[in-house]
């Protein structure tokens, strides 16, 4: 998932559906997608989820009930959600949001395959050693 496409469409409308836990993205021309908060959270572009390079990713679990509690624009190119579990360091470019919206089936399969390979349940709590504690270099 690159999240970096030169011609990424910019949503013309964005709606946070708190009860159904989805972000609705409306695009010029009539396209409309509903991206589950859980999918957004497990594919967060933040360093604490993605790591600083290949193989450093942290598999996210226990995010099925996560909500978006705040949503801030980042310039004219991205959104920064704050999730109910306290995660707020992911900056979601228009390209990444469009990828999450249009590749949901494949991304869910990839996520479930990673869970299975790790022998972890989707709703398992995150291990204490992988919880965010700030950023250290």
Predicted regions and their residues:
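Motif-centric detector for short Cys/His coordination patterns
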Residues: 1-137
């Amino acid at each position: 998932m690159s999240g970096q496409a030169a011609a990424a469409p910019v949503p013309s409308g964005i709606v946070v559906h708190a009860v159904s836990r989805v972000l609705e993205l409306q695009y010029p021309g009539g396209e409309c997608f509903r991206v589950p908060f859980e999918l957004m959270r497990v594919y967060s572009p933040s360093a604490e989820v993605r790591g600083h390079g290949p193989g450093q990713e942290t598999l996210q679990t226990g995010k099925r009930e996560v909500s978006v509690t705040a949503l801030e624009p980042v310039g004219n190119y991205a959104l920064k959600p704050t999730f109910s579990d306290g995660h707020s360091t992911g900056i979601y470019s228009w390209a990444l949001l469009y990828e999450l919206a249009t590749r949901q089936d494949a991304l869910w399969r990839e996520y479930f395959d990673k869970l299975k390979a790790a022998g972890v349940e989707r709703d398992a709590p995150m291990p204490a050693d992988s919880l965010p504690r700030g950023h250290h270099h």
